[in-house]
Amino acid sequence: MRNKYIESFEKAQLENRNIPEFRAGDTVKVAVRIKEGSKERVQNYEGLCIAIRGQGTGRTFMVRKMGANSVGVERIFPLYSDSIESIEVLRKGRVRRAKLFYLRELKGKAARIKELRRK
């Protein structure tokens, strides 16, 4: 049984955010607010969502992108973080798993995900 005050706080947090619906296998672009000293800027992080975990305000998602020299870079974002300015879904992927950790071992064209076709 959860505390009613925590539930009401989480409900208020969830209502204020405009987050698109996405799943593992989708290519997303996350605009993250970064503070460096007294300056603040927005940095885009584009990659494949390979996992979504948790529930409520503690929900997180993992994005994997290929960096320089074909090195995979993974980053975990809290879904309802204040540092996330926006999330944009670029492509819907067709996958049959909720966690795509097997992509870590695949290289090049083998690591591609087919696009979901709408009928």
Swiss-Prot record:
Pfam families in the cross-refs: Ribosomal_L19 (PF01245)
One annotated Gene Ontology cellular component of this protein: cytosolic large ribosomal subunit
Keyword terms: Ribonucleoprotein, Ribosomal protein
Protein's GO biological process: translation
Chain coiled-coil ranges: none
GO terms of molecular function: structural constituent of ribosome
Function, in words: This protein is located at the 30S-50S ribosomal subunit interface and may play a role in the structure and function of the aminoacyl-tRNA binding site.
Family statement: Belongs to the bacterial ribosomal protein bL19 family.
Protein name: Large ribosomal subunit protein bL19
